[in-house]
Regions:
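Membrane-water interface segments at the C-terminal ends of transmembrane alpha-helices
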Residues: 2-31, 41-140, 168-188, 216-235, ...
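Peri-membrane helix termini and adjoining interfacial loops of integral membrane proteins
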Residues: 25-35, 194-200, 241-250
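Short amphipathic alpha-helical coupling elements at transmembrane boundaries
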Residues: 30, 34-38, 84, 107, ...
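Amphipathic alpha-helical segments in well-structured domains
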Residues: 40, 44, 86, 146, ...
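Juxtamembrane helix-boundary/capping and inter-helix hinge elements in multi-pass membrane proteins
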Residues: 75-79, 140-145, 155-158, 209-213
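Flexible interhelical linker loops that connect adjacent transmembrane helices
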Residues: 237-269
């Protein structure tokens, strides 16, 4: 009896959680039947702004997260352990807070912090830890044999990264980029503060400012399609990453020691993004 009650309660909670989505789909289907689906006067610009923000931030986050992931896993230098922990700090800092801080500092210095370029920088710095976490997991699984084989052939750490570790880690990096994209598409505060036309801001403006629920629903459906695509891509890439990891010889990797200017450069590279 208690198990049946728990099942009913779980079903009711699931229905409540899915109810807004079902309403959205119902309104969208009615609009399709009546030919009323329209994106509003700025819908195309908002979709383009979201896609550009997504692509630019994904590129920046991939470079930062992957480079730091390889450096902090497979190179040995003073402060490496603390820098690995520091890479997670952006996850505790909302993108809106980061953009507001930049706008405030820029206004005091006479700079205009506004537009797509700054939005890409903010979102890349706020979300790159997703790529960092998954890439470090993959790099850590690359194992001793691969790195020792590179050393025996006289290949340095960055050449080993480019030739061996990066191809193996690509599915994990792609999954991290998909997680980045889900957060970027749903960001509202930062894009409004920086004046970037986006789907999230467009939905709010269409519903509240323009009193156009049809356009708001249409934009929400476009957002839903993008997010579903990212979810499906993340799941597939995560499974592919596991298959790659299962087929790669494991073991504790021997880190390359860095000294002098190389160690200082590694410390700066790991310290600047957080």
């Amino acid at each position: 009896m208690s198990r049946r009650l728990l099942t009913l309660l779980a079903s009711a909670l699931a229905l409540l959680a899915l109810w807004p989505l079902l309403q959205l789909l119902s309104q969208g289907l009615q609009g399709l039947q009546q030919g009323l689906v329209q994106l509003g006067p700025d819908g195309g610009r908002q979709i383009r702004g979201t896609l550009l923000l997504l692509l630019g931030s994904a590129l920046g986050g991939t470079v930062i997260g992957t480079a730091n992931g390889w450096l902090l896993i497979n190179c040995r230098f003073p402060g490496r352990r603390w820098l690995r922990i520091a890479q997670l700090i952006p996850l505790a800092t909302p993108a809106y807070l980061l953009s507001a801080t930049l706008v405030d500092l820029g206004s005091r210095a006479g700079w205009r912090i506004h537009g797509l370029g700054w939005g890409i920088a903010v979102m890349a710095l706020a979300t790159y830890p997703y790529v960092f976490l998954l890439s470090t997991e993959s790099f850590g699984m690359s194992g001793r044999r691969q790195l020792e084989a590179c050393r025996s052939m006289g290949i340095g750490p960055w050449s080993a990264f480019r030739r061996v570790a990066l191809p193996i880690a690509m599915p994990a990096i792609g999954a991290g980029v998909a997680l980045m994209g889900m957060e970027i598409v749903n960001e509202l505060g930062a894009v409004q503060l920086l004046g970037i036309p986006s789907l999230s801001a467009g939905i709010l403006d269409a519903w509240q400012s323009n009193s156009d629920p049809t356009a708001a629903i249409s934009l929400a459906l476009v957002t839903l399609v993008i997010v579903l695509g990212l979810v499906v891509g993340e799941r597939r890439l995560r499974r592919r990453s596991r298959r790659w990891s299962d087929g790669v010889a494991g073991g504790d990797a021997t880190a390359w020691p860095l000294h002098g200017t190389r160690a200082l450069a590694a410390q700066l590279l790991g310290l600047i993004p957080p």
